[in-house]
Amino acid sequence: MGNNNDWLNFEHLAEEKQIDAVKPPSMYKVILNNDDYTPMEFVIDVLQKFFSYDIERATQLMLTVHYQGKAICGVFTAEVAETKVVHVNRYARENEHPLLCTLEKA
């Protein structure tokens, strides 16, 4: 039996099979949209409860929603963004507010 150490050499495996680079997941912006009925205090509550913003940042974002018509609450993977949208919209309806949370690709 000869001294054949080819089985220890793994370089040929890399040449035979191209390893695909792992792509980062698609990201989505979660957006709060303005309406004429949802109280500003409720929007602040939503931003604190679902996005963990402190009162100052939540107030800034609420004012952006109010004056610019919408604000980005955060950028998340698809699953996280979808879950946040569902939870925010459900919470708004449970509290009888028309606040609309949407998502769009980042």
Swiss-Prot record:
One GO BP: protein catabolic process
Gene3D superfamilies the record matches: 3.30.1390.10
Pfam families: ClpS
SUPFAM superfamilies membership: ClpS-like
Function: Involved in the modulation of the specificity of the ClpAP-mediated ATP-dependent protein degradation.
Family note: Belongs to the ClpS family.
Subunit record text: Binds to the N-terminal domain of the chaperone ClpA.
Name of protein: ATP-dependent Clp protease adapter protein ClpS
Organism listed in the record: Serratia proteamaculans (strain 568)
Gene name as annotated: clpS
